[in-house]
Protein backbone atom coordinates (compact mmCIF):
# COMPACT_ATOMS: atom_id res chain seq x y z
CA UNK A 1 0.00 0.00 0.00
CA UNK A 2 1.27 3.49 -0.82
CA UNK A 3 2.35 5.75 2.06
CA UNK A 4 -0.59 7.84 3.15
CA UNK A 5 -0.35 11.60 3.40
CA UNK A 6 -2.61 13.59 5.70
CA UNK A 7 -5.38 15.45 3.90
CA UNK A 8 -5.00 19.20 4.38
CA UNK A 9 -7.44 20.78 1.93
CA UNK A 10 -10.37 20.17 4.26
CA UNK A 11 -8.95 22.81 6.59
CA UNK A 12 -9.81 25.44 4.00
CA UNK A 13 -13.53 24.73 4.14
CA UNK A 14 -15.38 27.76 5.54
CA UNK A 15 -17.16 27.78 8.87
CA UNK A 16 -20.27 29.05 7.11
CA UNK A 17 -20.84 25.56 5.72
CA UNK A 18 -22.21 24.56 9.10
CA UNK A 19 -25.32 26.57 8.26
CA UNK A 20 -26.24 23.81 5.84
CA UNK A 21 -26.66 21.50 8.81
CA UNK A 22 -29.34 23.58 10.49
CA UNK A 23 -32.03 23.65 7.82
CA UNK A 24 -35.61 23.31 9.07
CA UNK A 25 -36.78 19.71 9.32
CA UNK A 26 -39.43 17.79 11.19
CA UNK A 27 -38.05 16.76 14.56
CA UNK A 28 -38.70 13.45 16.25
CA UNK A 29 -41.71 12.94 18.49
CA UNK A 30 -41.28 12.17 22.16
CA UNK A 31 -42.03 8.83 23.71
CA UNK A 32 -40.45 5.43 23.34
CA UNK A 33 -41.59 2.51 21.21
CA UNK A 34 -40.78 -1.08 22.04
CA UNK A 35 -38.01 -2.88 20.18
CA UNK A 36 -40.16 -6.02 20.43
CA UNK A 37 -43.08 -4.39 18.64
CA UNK A 38 -44.34 -5.66 15.26
CA UNK A 39 -44.00 -2.08 13.94
CA UNK A 40 -40.25 -2.06 14.60
CA UNK A 41 -39.77 -5.55 13.19
CA UNK A 42 -41.64 -4.58 10.02
CA UNK A 43 -39.60 -1.38 9.70
CA UNK A 44 -36.26 -3.19 10.08
CA UNK A 45 -37.31 -5.75 7.48
CA UNK A 46 -38.06 -2.95 5.03
CA UNK A 47 -34.68 -1.32 5.71
CA UNK A 48 -32.80 -4.60 5.33
CA UNK A 49 -34.35 -5.01 1.89
CA UNK A 50 -32.78 -1.73 0.73
CA UNK A 51 -29.82 -3.23 -1.09
CA UNK A 52 -29.32 -0.18 -3.32
CA UNK A 53 -29.75 3.44 -2.29
CA UNK A 54 -27.99 6.77 -2.38
CA UNK A 55 -28.12 9.98 -0.40
CA UNK A 56 -26.30 13.30 -0.41
CA UNK A 57 -26.05 16.18 2.01
CA UNK A 58 -23.85 18.00 4.52
CA UNK A 59 -21.08 16.52 6.66
CA UNK A 60 -19.35 18.01 9.70
CA UNK A 61 -16.60 16.50 11.84
CA UNK A 62 -15.95 18.52 15.00
CA UNK A 63 -13.36 17.86 17.70
CA UNK A 64 -10.97 19.81 19.91
CA UNK A 65 -8.25 19.23 17.32
CA UNK A 66 -10.03 19.94 14.06
CA UNK A 67 -13.22 21.07 12.37
CA UNK A 68 -14.12 19.71 8.95
CA UNK A 69 -17.11 20.76 6.84
CA UNK A 70 -17.91 19.16 3.50
CA UNK A 71 -20.60 17.87 1.20
CA UNK A 72 -21.01 14.10 1.00
CA UNK A 73 -22.49 11.54 -1.38
CA UNK A 74 -23.14 7.98 -0.17
CA UNK A 75 -24.00 5.27 -2.69
CA UNK A 76 -24.81 1.77 -1.46
CA UNK A 77 -24.97 -0.58 -4.45
CA UNK A 78 -24.78 -3.90 -2.57
CA UNK A 79 -25.24 -4.83 1.13
CA UNK A 80 -21.45 -5.05 1.50
CA UNK A 81 -20.35 -2.51 -1.12
CA UNK A 82 -20.60 1.27 -1.01
CA UNK A 83 -19.01 4.48 -2.26
CA UNK A 84 -18.45 7.60 -0.15
CA UNK A 85 -17.55 10.91 -1.78
CA UNK A 86 -16.54 14.07 0.11
CA UNK A 87 -16.43 17.36 -1.79
CA UNK A 88 -15.63 20.96 -0.91
CA UNK A 89 -18.12 23.86 -1.33
CA UNK A 90 -16.85 24.44 -4.87
CA UNK A 91 -17.82 20.89 -5.81
CA UNK A 92 -14.28 19.57 -6.15
CA UNK A 93 -13.66 16.04 -4.89
CA UNK A 94 -11.46 15.86 -1.80
CA UNK A 95 -11.83 12.15 -1.12
CA UNK A 96 -13.47 9.11 -2.69
CA UNK A 97 -13.79 5.86 -0.76
CA UNK A 98 -14.91 2.63 -2.45
CA UNK A 99 -15.52 -0.23 -0.02
CA UNK A 100 -16.13 -3.89 -0.77
CA UNK A 101 -15.36 -7.06 1.21
CA UNK A 102 -11.64 -7.22 2.08
CA UNK A 103 -10.78 -4.27 -0.17
CA UNK A 104 -10.99 -0.51 0.30
CA UNK A 105 -9.81 1.98 -2.31
CA UNK A 106 -9.24 5.62 -1.35
CA UNK A 107 -8.65 8.25 -4.04
CA UNK A 108 -7.38 11.69 -2.99
CA UNK A 109 -7.94 15.09 -4.60
CA UNK A 110 -4.93 14.54 -6.87
CA UNK A 111 -6.28 11.26 -8.19
CA UNK A 112 -3.77 9.12 -6.28
CA UNK A 113 -5.15 5.77 -5.15
CA UNK A 114 -4.46 3.96 -1.89
CA UNK A 115 -5.59 0.49 -0.83
CA UNK A 116 -6.39 -1.22 2.46
CA UNK A 117 -8.57 -3.98 3.86
CA UNK A 118 -9.91 -1.65 6.59
CA UNK A 119 -11.97 1.43 5.59
CA UNK A 120 -11.93 2.96 9.09
CA UNK A 121 -8.17 2.67 9.31
CA UNK A 122 -7.38 4.14 5.90
CA UNK A 123 -9.70 7.14 6.29
CA UNK A 124 -8.18 7.85 9.72
CA UNK A 125 -4.63 7.61 8.39
CA UNK A 126 -5.51 9.89 5.50
CA UNK A 127 -7.65 12.53 7.25
CA UNK A 128 -7.08 12.00 11.00
CA UNK A 129 -10.87 11.61 11.34
CA UNK A 130 -12.14 8.72 13.46
CA UNK A 131 -15.33 7.61 11.66
CA UNK A 132 -17.05 4.30 12.58
CA UNK A 133 -17.79 3.42 8.96
CA UNK A 134 -18.57 -0.25 9.57
CA UNK A 135 -21.64 0.71 11.59
CA UNK A 136 -22.32 4.09 9.99
CA UNK A 137 -23.46 2.30 6.84
CA UNK A 138 -26.26 0.83 8.99
CA UNK A 139 -26.90 3.88 11.18
CA UNK A 140 -27.34 6.16 8.18
CA UNK A 141 -30.52 4.25 7.21
CA UNK A 142 -31.85 3.97 10.76
CA UNK A 143 -30.66 0.46 11.65
CA UNK A 144 -28.75 -0.18 14.91
CA UNK A 145 -26.00 -2.21 13.21
CA UNK A 146 -23.94 -4.11 15.78
CA UNK A 147 -25.37 -2.08 18.69
CA UNK A 148 -27.59 -3.87 21.19
CA UNK A 149 -28.34 -0.77 23.26
CA UNK A 150 -30.81 1.47 21.43
CA UNK A 151 -34.12 3.28 21.94
CA UNK A 152 -37.04 3.96 19.62
CA UNK A 153 -39.30 6.99 19.35
CA UNK A 154 -43.09 6.96 19.46
CA UNK A 155 -43.18 6.13 15.74
CA UNK A 156 -41.02 3.02 16.25
CA UNK A 157 -38.00 4.61 14.56
CA UNK A 158 -34.51 4.74 16.03
CA UNK A 159 -34.08 7.60 18.50
CA UNK A 160 -30.70 6.85 20.11
CA UNK A 161 -27.99 4.21 19.74
CA UNK A 162 -25.12 3.48 22.12
CA UNK A 163 -22.27 1.35 20.83
CA UNK A 164 -18.88 0.44 22.28
CA UNK A 165 -15.95 -0.01 19.91
CA UNK A 166 -12.31 -0.44 20.92
CA UNK A 167 -13.04 0.84 24.42
CA UNK A 168 -14.86 3.96 23.16
CA UNK A 169 -18.61 4.56 23.33
CA UNK A 170 -20.38 6.11 20.36
CA UNK A 171 -23.80 7.69 20.87
CA UNK A 172 -25.99 8.25 17.83
CA UNK A 173 -28.87 10.73 18.10
CA UNK A 174 -31.55 10.74 15.41
CA UNK A 175 -32.94 14.26 15.17
CA UNK A 176 -35.43 13.93 12.32
CA UNK A 177 -36.68 11.58 9.61
CA UNK A 178 -37.86 11.93 6.03
CA UNK A 179 -41.32 10.38 6.16
CA UNK A 180 -41.95 11.00 2.44
CA UNK A 181 -39.85 7.91 1.69
CA UNK A 182 -40.93 4.30 2.20
CA UNK A 183 -39.60 3.23 4.60
CA UNK A 184 -38.94 6.43 6.55
CA UNK A 185 -35.23 7.32 6.47
CA UNK A 186 -33.14 9.68 8.63
CA UNK A 187 -32.44 13.17 7.40
CA UNK A 188 -30.49 14.46 10.43
CA UNK A 189 -28.31 12.53 12.83
CA UNK A 190 -25.37 13.20 15.12
CA UNK A 191 -22.64 10.85 16.35
CA UNK A 192 -20.85 11.69 19.60
CA UNK A 193 -17.74 10.08 21.08
CA UNK A 194 -15.81 12.02 23.71
CA UNK A 195 -15.02 15.44 22.22
CA UNK A 196 -15.80 14.20 18.69
CA UNK A 197 -19.05 14.98 16.92
CA UNK A 198 -20.07 13.91 13.44
CA UNK A 199 -23.13 15.63 11.97
CA UNK A 200 -24.94 14.41 8.89
CA UNK A 201 -27.83 16.11 7.14
CA UNK A 202 -29.31 14.17 4.24
CA UNK A 203 -30.87 16.40 1.58
CA UNK A 204 -32.60 13.56 -0.26
CA UNK A 205 -32.75 9.80 -0.69
CA UNK A 206 -32.99 7.60 -3.78
CA UNK A 207 -33.88 3.96 -3.14
CA UNK A 208 -34.38 0.83 -5.22
UniProtKB/Swiss-Prot annotation:
GO terms for cellular component: cell outer membrane. SUPFAM superfamilies: Prokaryotic lipoproteins and lipoprotein localization factors. Pfam families: LolB. It is a lipid-anchor. Residues 1-23 form the signal peptide. One of its GO terms (biological process) is protein transport. Coiled coil: none annotated. A lipid is attached at residue 24 (N-palmitoyl cysteine). InterPro entries: LolA/LolB/LppX, OM_lipoprot_LolB. A lipid is attached at residue 24 (S-diacylglycerol cysteine). NCBIfam families: lolB. Monomer. Belongs to the LolB family. Plays a critical role in the incorporation of lipoproteins in the outer membrane after they are released by the LolA protein. This is Outer-membrane lipoprotein LolB. It comes from Photorhabdus laumondii subsp. laumondii (strain DSM 15139 / CIP 105565 / TT01) (Photorhabdus luminescens subsp. laumondii). The lineage of its organism: Bacteria, Pseudomonadati, Pseudomonadota, Gammaproteobacteria, Enterobacterales.
